[in-house]
Amino acid sequence: MLVVGLTGDLSELPLADLVQMTSIGGKTGRLVLYDEEDAVAGVLLFRDGRLVGARAGELVAERAFYALLALATGTFDFDPTAELDDDGVDLPTESLLIEGMRRLDEVQRLRRRLPAPAVVRYRGGSTEDPLQMRVLGYLGPGARTVGDIVAGALVGGDADEYDALSALSSLEELGVLRVEPPAEEEGESGGPPQPELEP
């Protein structure tokens, strides 16, 4: 019997659709995902349509799956003959997809509310939440951009962009942090009108 793998582009066949096809078809194999630079972004392992392993950098299991679900571009390679060194987990594919899509929607909403160039300043107060404490520790007494804080919060491998933005949002709502809009670039509205140059 000939066993054929599947290779393709994530912009044409999104990961959510690919996972659904693999799950519904009861497929077994290793799905390797590559980013735009053709570097390995992560690996998903399936046995009889069930997700039995997920890795993305230092993230594993559900967190790895959620991070990989955000890949909109890149390529994939599904190898049904690969030996599976699964993580000893059995992840419910359908509920992971539902939660993953919810998290993607929430990240988009948080990105609009907390754009990467926005400046974050400490106002005072504390928290006992470990990730919020990490955000505060990374911020320190000065000011940093949302993008810098999110990148700093991801160090350690147990958080993703959703977690970092959610922690920032919660700290802002508690009044511990203040998020200021990005400074307008020179020449934008707010300054005196510039004289027109005649040709």
Predicted segment positions?
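Acidic, Ser/Thr/Pro-enriched low-complexity segments and adjacent helix/loop capping patches
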Residues: 1-199
